[in-house]
Amino acid sequence: VLPSVQAAVAAGVEEIVVAQEAAAEAELVPGARVTAVRHVGQLVERYGGRLSAAVAAALEQVTEAATDDAPTTPPRDAEQPDLADVVGQSEARQALEVAAAGGHHLIMVGPPGTGKTMLAERLPSILPPLEQADAVTVTSLHSVAGIFDPARGLITRPPLRAPHHTATRAAVVGGGSGLPRPGDVSLAHRGVLFLDEAPEFSAGVLDCLRQPLESGVVTIDRVGGRASYPAAFQLVLAANPCPCGKAGGRGLECTCTSLQRRRYFSRLSGPLLD
């Protein structure tokens, strides 16, 4: 709903009619004059039409049944992780602060349990709130993906997306049947895309990050058509120092050969690291 209303306002449409359930989402677009109707009968009557008593009664009955099934408890916002929660880790905290201030990408390498994931999840907490235009764009992307809850209002904080290392290219970049839907790179627009265990991702997924990193846009071609979505994000990679994860750890003996270590990090291509 949100992207459609945004496009209508940009095209100069003066009044936008939506279902009552979609009114909260439609009204998030600045400049939108939204009219909400419970059923099509109200729309007919608004513009001078008349319905027979039987049709009007049937519409009211169907609408009341649908309203009774709708949830009435508003969702609760999840508390966002905060960098202030981190104790110690002064060098890592400073690296995050520099990355946040300059919009730099970041890679963290260390043994398991050293706090890489905890730190990455808290990077959005030190980024500035989204500008109004960016907030509408980010919210629109989540709406197109079908994961936006209008009851929470506009997304005003930089989003964080952290796909699993088994995620497919379609999940990370976007895709699906019919019109392609945005993937994690677009859902992280103006926020953070965090790839934990980065060398474990498939080479195809890692290589497909190069286009959005260079242009801030991702283009998806499917049989159902072509779609371009914004994808300007900060990339944070986390990796173990070797396949077994023990290299560099205190009191731990690495069992990997030098060849295994080279192969492990060779999955992160030079262009991606650049």
Regions found by a protein language model. Give the residues of each.
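Conserved alpha-helical scaffold flanking the Walker A/P-loop in AAA+ ATPase domains
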Residues: E97, G153-P159, A170-L193, R226
